[in-house]
């Protein structure tokens, strides 16, 4: 009976394995994603036959790029020719459903090849996370290094999240993401995951790596370079064709083996771990591939350092046997010895293949699954335009914008306790998903376009103490239970600015009053409308007088830029649906032209910027073209409708980042590059235009950032040309912004290119410090240049650098940047550098370029800064 049970168990296991292998061969357990190829596209790899699909369905951020042309014809696999990079966020995540869901074991592999896709020639470094837990660091040697990172784990959820995390050493990217279903009975350990350290095929020199279809799990086997001390055995027969071993190394891998050339009694396998304290599991795969005589055998003992861990291991002909270290191993150097026992007919040890995995213990506990599901539903329902990727709460440094979480102890899942998605362009009804946030205390949905009634389930959230739904389009009656909780003080309820929403005890009275007393209000409203119409006509008439009669007030100007009718502008902006910016000129709206996003600047009737400034901006943008100046797509010039259409800048303006209005914190490297971009744009205005142009309103909010965080100068309505033959001065009424205005202007009432230099210097100081141009206290207002000078006089560079950087910056470049900024903000223009000199100095910081200074006068080779003494900051 026992023998029958054993036979039954073997047959069941064999059939299960056979079923699994059949499915592995048809790729039903594979997910293969080529990052960066066009949306919804796919193809079959020419070598492996694996079907790769676009990553567009698995990620909602990032920029797709193709590697540099010089590498595209170098024989690299097709799936390495494109990448998706992530310049905008600290953490960016793929969310991928696993082939069989949770509870099954998977091999998850990411592949990276830089290929100079961004034309920067700087190989980035960044971190890789699986969900909330650190996986590994990504470090590439050069542009053509192909790096594979693999991890084996059993997910707790149906989806896995693979995240790249920026650590201020270049922009993270991903080339390939692959998931492979494994047997749960393989790679068994008591730990959360195993990270691949190496996987070796003891084979012939020059052999290519083996993978699918040779390997049913699509593991990539790297050929080992064999030294002269060893020799290679091989066979042309298939190894393990009867599916003897669940690990199933590729037959092409197992058909070769390594042994000592002098038929030594032992074979030594050694490796030096990158971390001597880390724990490793070692998997040795063996198969006899030589035909032995009847009296011959190949067996050996396996030793770890000085201890035997397998007293006798005997090989079988053309069948794979796998030895796994019973416990994890560690140390500075790990030595395995395969030792042949004495005997005339015992052959020396061999090895066919080897895998080494590092133990990965998941120390971070993810957000409670109920909260995760709720937040994902909210994100999907409202298409929230925030950086909501990965786990909502963990790691704390990368938690979702607008949420706060709490974790009662180190063994429980964090819970969402506060959610602020006010002014987030939410539309539709309040979704039932909010009812699953059972730990939430504060919920702010104000400033959106939510419709329908306030759902009663909000009153049942047991921990809710603050609810704000102001400024929506909600209708009906506030639920009685919410009203009662508001009255008894257990809930702070705000629901104003919803015209069709009322409390239960006031609605009937309001309706009665509206029915019986509508005549008088209608009369009053009619009178008000007439008065307002008359006032508007009068103001419009006065505005026309102020703007003058410059001839071309209606219709196209003399420019090659595209002219749009106002009706077209209405369509481009979808009836001015989405405001993306505001200023003294009016509002900026989001628009789309032929599928491309644009920014639509509409001059309001009340704007201080009149037709003169509008015409100046069109004229200037018509003749300037530079990568660091915003480009004009088109314009509209109809009576009462003046519109400028620019290229769309996805990351808005520098001012928002410095003021902390965006959750993303600019790294030191990004700040340096943005500063250089802005300086290059201004340098082009000063030296690349004939006649030269002074911007006159340089400030952070006029420095726009595209999806790559490339900076471009904007807002040229106040710009003016100046003469280089004459004094180079512009006599002008006041222009510019307080804090950025050239101090000489107050005495001379004139501005020149050095005025832009001063303004840029103030911007550079803001970039360094993260502080505003003017800091106000109860007793005084201090300009940022005076504040920085006073601190640097004591040699304290760390005292001025933005604390949000947490000292993740180069001290030397911080000193140099400060020197440049203070030189630019000298009170006397003659002591300031030219914009060309500023660009030269910034390039030295950003690129480490040693520039040729022979074209500059000796007196301007060094930017000096006048502090309280004549000291120049050099304490680096």
From Swiss-Prot:
Its main location: membrane. Residues 539-876 are cytoplasmic. Residues 574-847 form the Protein kinase domain. LRR repeats lie at residues 415-438, 439-462, 463-483. The chain crosses the membrane at residues 518-538. Induction: Highly induced by WRKY22 or WRKY29 and by WRKY6 in senescent leaves. Also induced 30 minutes after flagellin treatment. InterPro entries: Kinase-like_dom_sf, Leu-rich_rpt, LRR_dom_sf, Malectin-like_Carb-bd_dom, Prot_kinase_dom, Protein_kinase_ATP_BS, Ser/Thr_kinase_AS. The modification Phosphothreonine is found at residue 732. This is Senescence-induced receptor-like serine/threonine-protein kinase. The gene is SIRK.
